[in-house]
């Protein structure tokens, strides 16, 4: 489930990403810069994700937000200046289908351990 579907509400009025469904697709990103007060720059921009359905959501963090991106970088609002260089974050892509098409492999992780690699065999195909 991507961030776009996560914003949908179920019959009980709860967001799907906090109720019945769990996220399984993430983009692992690293903090590259904290030079500007209140902001951090990560290495996940448009070349690793599709934002046609909205920007990604930072998994498990309500205190920071992904607010902008360029081709190769993302800007994270960090009002409390908590993030440090090389900190790792998991992004929930705004739209999973075209995000997957930008990658060659799924890296399958269970309990913090890589357990498999799945090729994205249709990557870049337009038929």
Briefly describe each language-model feature range.
Residues 1-127:
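Active-site anion/phosphate-binding pocket segments in diverse small-molecule metabolic enzymes
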């Amino acid at each position: 489930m991507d961030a776009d579907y996560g914003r949908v509400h179920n019959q009980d009025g709860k967001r799907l990403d906090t109720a019945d469904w769990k996220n399984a697709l993430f983009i692992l990103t690293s903090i590259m810069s904290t030079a500007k007060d209140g902001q951090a720059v990560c290495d996940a921009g448009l070349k690793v994700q599709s934002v046609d359905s909205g920007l990604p959501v930072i998994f498990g963090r309500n205190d920071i937000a992904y607010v902008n991106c360029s081709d190769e970088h993302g800007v994270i609002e960090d009002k409390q200046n908590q993030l440090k260089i090389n900190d790792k974050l998991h992004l929930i892509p705004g739209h999973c289908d075209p995000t997957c098409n930008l990658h060659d492999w799924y890296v399958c992780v269970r309990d913090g351990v890589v357990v498999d690699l799945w090729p994205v065999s249709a990557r870049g195909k337009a038929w």
